[in-house]
Amino acid sequence: MEAIEETPQLVKGLTYRGRKTSRAGSEQRRRAILEAALRIVVRDGVRGVRHRAVAREADVPLSATTYYFRDISDLITDTFTLFVEMGAEKFRSFWEDSHCALRNTIRHTSDSAEFGQHRVNATTDLATAYVLNRLRHHRDYLIAEQAFKLECLRNANLRSIAFKHQQYLLNDLVGFFRQAGSDNAGVDARLMFMVIMSVEYEGLLQNPDSLDETTIRGYLHRQVEIMLNHVVRR
């Protein structure tokens, strides 16, 4: 998991459960512990997160992990919280750039069927770029995401965080499809979310250097075309 030097702004609705810190040094150590726990999640799954293992990974005394996180449940929950914050920061610029690119595409097209298809293709290109970028450059993030999703089936404490994590992406997708011309952006966003999750899971099972881009784009294009069918048929 890529380390982040600066602590991201707390995503709305997320709170930490571990011991609060007031000094910069203490916050850095707490952050180092959580980042170490994230690396373990990627390597060994959530069940590999134990105080001793995290202390060893973070190169801190065992007493440090138990000081900030007396309960292993708090450590796992706060690790997931950090993961969600990192994701929100990591992909925010992509969605901002995508909205700008899509807006420029729409500005230079008309309402004809030909340009409607062009809009579908542009939307597909952006969605494909998003998925391929995550599969090629953020595999650790996606592996951690899969591990936390599985753990949510066992650990009810993580579910509210999982729903927030899902909602952040859905919010971006709703805005994206509304701008693309969807007549039901909320439903389309949820359907696209499920397609993206499926495509990413399949992609994680492949070598990142030999991803089947044609198949990935084909899945996404078909979904976008169905969603924006009314735009193409004008």
Question: Which sequence ranges carry the predicted segments?
Answer:
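N-terminal intrinsically disordered/low-complexity leader segments
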Residues: 1-28, 39, 102-103, 231-234
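Hydrophobic alpha-helical connector segments
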Residues: 91-138, 192
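Helix-turn-helix
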Residues: 32, 40-82
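A short, mixed-charge helix-start or loop-turn motif at secondary-structure junctions
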Residues: 15-22, 113, 130-131, 155, ...
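Amphipathic, non-transmembrane alpha-helical scaffold segments
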Residues: 26, 30, 80, 84, ...
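Amphipathic alpha-helical packing segments from all-alpha helical-bundle domains
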Residues: 89, 134-180, 190
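Hydrophobic/aromatic-rich alpha-helical bundle segments in the mid-to-C-terminal region
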Residues: 159-167, 176-234
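N-terminal positioning helix adjacent to the helix-turn-helix/winged-helix DNA-binding module
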Residues: 29-32, 36, 188
